[in-house]
């Protein structure tokens, strides 16, 4: 049981980080295009 909880926590954290990186990159691209 403890092993299953750790595995579920690992993929969830990686997906959250990737989503944040994409949002930051999209915002930076918009700022550069506006400038």
Swiss-Prot record:
Predominant subcellular localization, coarse grouping: nucleus
Keyword field contains Nucleus: yes
Keywords from the named record: Chromosome, Developmental protein, Differentiation, DNA condensation, DNA-binding, Nucleosome core, Nucleus, Phosphoprotein, Spermatogenesis
Tissue: Gonads.
Post-translational modification: Phosphorylated in immature sperm. Dephosphorylated in mature sperm allowing a stronger interaction with DNA.
Coiled coil stretches, renumbered: none
Lipid metabolism listed as a keyword: no
Region annotation (Disordered) ranges: 1-35
Sites of Phosphoserine modification: 9, 21
GO cellular component: nucleosome; nucleus
Subcellular location: Nucleus; Chromosome
Example GO molecular function: DNA binding
GO process terms (BP): cell differentiation; mitotic chromosome condensation; nucleosome assembly; spermatogenesis
Reported function: Protamines substitute for histones in the chromatin of sperm during the haploid phase of spermatogenesis. They compact sperm DNA into a highly condensed, stable and inactive complex.
Miscellaneous remark of the record: Two isoforms exist, a major form and a minor form. This is the major form.
Name this polypeptide is given: Sperm protamine alpha isoform 1
């Amino acid at each position: 049981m403890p092993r299953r909880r750790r595995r579920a926590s690992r993929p969830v954290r990686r997906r959250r980080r990737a989503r944040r990186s994409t949002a930051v990159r999209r915002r930076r691209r918009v700022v550069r295009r506006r400038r």
